[in-house]
């Protein structure tokens, strides 16, 4: 258990200066003051600190991005520290323009790594190009059978004749 004392809490509306009790990784209660607990727990004084829900980033190139301008334009894969520093607790990863040197298998592996590190991580199957790269061989099967896959990444281009 963790007791956070004296935090300015937004959930997401402003609740004021409160104490917050976390049990088993979940918020148990938020009160003006929590004084007596049935068991010992870690206490964190958050005086002068702001406590907010974690942010969700629904478009993240967790295995890196870029690449459309040649190899030197590729960006590195995301590190857990980048999420923590920005208050992001939930991500949805996708490939983007580079479905050749990056793969949905690698994207799935990175999604699982982030989950194991404590982030709520999901992904979109597919990438630019047709047919769309998948894990199971079909986008609908990816969505149905792989829990971390929420949908498919599509990119459409218009050609004027």
Place the predicted regions along the sequence by residue:
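Acidic (Asp/Glu)-rich catalytic clusters
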Residues: 140-148
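Histidine-rich, glycine-flanked metal-binding segment
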Residues: 1-2, 9-52
